[in-house]
Amino acid sequence: FDIIHAFNGYRTCYYRTFAVGRATNAHRDAYKKARELIDSAIAMVKPGVTTDQIAALWPTAQEFGFSSEMEAFGLQFGHGLGLGLHERPVISRLNSLENPVEIEPGMVFALETYWPANDGHSAARIEEELVVTETGAELLTLFPAEELFVTNPY
């Protein structure tokens, strides 16, 4: 689910996926893929990198079950955060490949990834917030998301 807050007028936004009761192999595999996608994007973030370079790391819409980038818009995605929930830069295959923006120190944005499970009805979604430093990115979200969290396990 999407967790959204405001603090002194500034917005936050991050996704976490939970399994309730138990996680199947399909759930864990989807989560692992979503985590790999977001980790590769976070590792790419530093001043001078452009948004098309980040978007190019993500799979095409067809690779994860959608017919077009418009249909999949917002699933492999990045957006600035500030006084608004969705600010620039916008990072997606739909617009960044043709209209890249250079990443600069001080930018604050969220990166979101999604991957469908092979069971036909489940999926995993992860979103992390970060600030661009002089040398890379500092993660702002502290709620753990390295592994799929199972609540009320049985």
List the predicted regions and their residue ranges.
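Active-site neighborhoods and metal-handling regions in enzymes and metal-associated proteins
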Residues: F1-Y154
